[in-house]
C-alpha cells in the first residue's frame, strides 16, 4: 500500500513499509540519492533520523496516526505521573531535612538547577520546553543543528551559566558505514561527543556541570568517555523525544548533597536502561531561608 512519488511532500507524516510502519516519521527533506528519490525523515516520537526511498513510504492518514500515537501518549502520561510522584517525594525529603524533621517552622525557598537545552529538532524542543514548564524546571532552550553544537556550546555556557546541559536532537547507527564501535558509522554521535568535550573544557568537574548527551542509537560509550554524566544509547535503541527532560529534571530537584542513583533516574523514563545510562551524579537543588512574603503579595 505505498504511495506515488507526487503524493509525498515535505512535512508529510509517513511510515516505512519495510518496517511495517511501526514508527511515524515526518519528511524534512527530499533528495536524489543514487538516482532514487529519497526522503530524509525525523521520527515523530523518537529521536531517530533516517533516509528512505519513496517506494518504501506510505503516507499516514490521521486515523492511522492516532492508532500508532495512542500507545505513546498513554506511556507519556504514565511516565509523567510516576515522575511527578518522584518529585513530590524529593520535595518532602527536602522539607523534612530543612525543618529538622518538622520540629521547626522555617519559611524556606528552593533553587533548582538551571538547564540549557540544545536541540537539533525545533518541534521536539517545543515539546520539551512545555514539559519543563509543567514540572517547574528553569530552562533556556536553543534550537541548534547537531553539527553546529561543538561551535555553539562554549559561548552559550558563557552566556547562560547553566548547572545542567542537554545536547540532543536526532541520530542513527548505519550498519553499512561500519561496526557499532566505529563512531563514524553514526549520523551525529561524533558531533555530540565534540560538544561534550567543549563543555567539559569549560567545566571539568562532573558535579559542577551535569551533561546529558545523545539521541536515538547514539554511541553511548564515547559520550560517557568524553565527559557526559548521562547519555544514550547503551543498546543502540531508539529513545523517546522527552526522555532527556525526565533525566535532568530529576537531577534539578535532588539536593546538592545527595547523589542521584542511575537506576532511580532512568527507571521511569519511556525508554529505560536499554536506551539510557550514566554515572552516579550529585543533585543541584539548593535550599535557602528565610522566605518572606512581601506586603504586595
Where do the protein language model's features map onto the residues?
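Mixed-charge, Lys/Arg-rich low-complexity intrinsically disordered regions
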Residues: 1-10
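Short, solvent-exposed secondary-structure boundary/capping segments
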Residues: 33-42
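Intrinsically disordered, low-complexity, charged/polar segments
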Residues: 45-101
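Short helix-loop-beta junction
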Residues: 129-140
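Proline-aspartate-enriched helix->loop->beta-strand connector
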Residues: 157-170, 228
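Catalytic cores of nucleophile-dependent amide-cleaving enzymes
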Residues: 193-239
Amino acid at each position: 500500500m505505498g504511495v506515488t512519488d507526487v503524493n509525498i511532500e515535505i512535512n508529510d507524516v509517513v511510515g516505512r513499509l519495510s518496517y511495517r510502519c511501526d514508527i511515524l516519521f515526518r519528511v524534512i527533506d527530499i533528495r536524489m540519492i543514487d538516482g532514487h528519490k529519497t526522503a530524509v525523515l525525523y521520527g515523530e516520537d523518537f529521536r531517530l533520523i533516517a533516509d528512505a526511498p519513496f517506494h518504501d513510504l506510505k503516507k499516514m492518514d490521521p486515523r492511522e496516526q492516532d492508532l500508532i500515537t495512542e500507545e505513546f501518549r498513554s506511556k507519556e502520561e504514565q511516565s509523567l505521573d510516576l515522575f511527578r510522584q518522584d518529585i513530590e517525594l524529593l520535595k518532602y525529603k527536602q522539607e523534612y531535612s530543612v525543618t529538622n524533621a518538622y520540629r521547626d517552622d522555617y519559611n524556606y525557598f528552593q533553587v533548582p538547577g538551571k538547564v540549557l537545552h540544545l536541540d537539533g529538532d525545533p518541534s521536539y524542543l517545543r515539546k520539551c520546553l512545555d514539559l519543563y514548564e509543567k514540572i517547574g524546571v528553569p530552562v533556556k532552550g536553543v534550537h541548534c543543528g547537531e553539527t553546529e553544537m561543538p561551535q555553539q556550546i562554549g559561548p552559550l555556557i558563557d552566556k547562560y551559566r547553566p548547572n545542567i546541559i542537554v545536547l540532543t536532537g536526532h541520530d542513527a547507527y548505519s550498519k553499512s558505514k561500519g561496526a557499532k564501535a566505529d563512531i563514524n558509522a553514526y549520523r551525529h554521535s561524533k558531533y555530540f561527543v565534540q560538544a561534550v568535550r567543549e563543555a567539559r573544557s569549560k567545566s571539568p568537574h562532573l558535579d559542577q556541570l551535569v551533561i546529558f548527551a545523545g539521541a536515538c542509537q547514539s554511541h553511548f560509550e564515547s559520550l560517557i568517555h568524553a565527559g557526559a554524566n548521562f547519555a544514550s544509547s547503551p543498546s543502540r535503541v531508539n529513545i523517546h523525544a522527552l526522555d532527556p527532560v525526565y533525566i535532568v529534571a530529576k537531577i534539578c530537584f535532588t539536593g546538592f548533597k545527595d547523589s542521584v542513583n542511575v537506576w532511580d533516574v532512568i527507571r521511569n523514563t519511556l525508554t529505560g536502561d536499554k536506551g539510557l545510562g550514566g554515572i552516579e551524579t550529585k543533585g543541584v537543588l539548593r535550599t535557602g531561608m528565610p522566605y518572606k512574603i512581601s506586603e504586595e503579595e
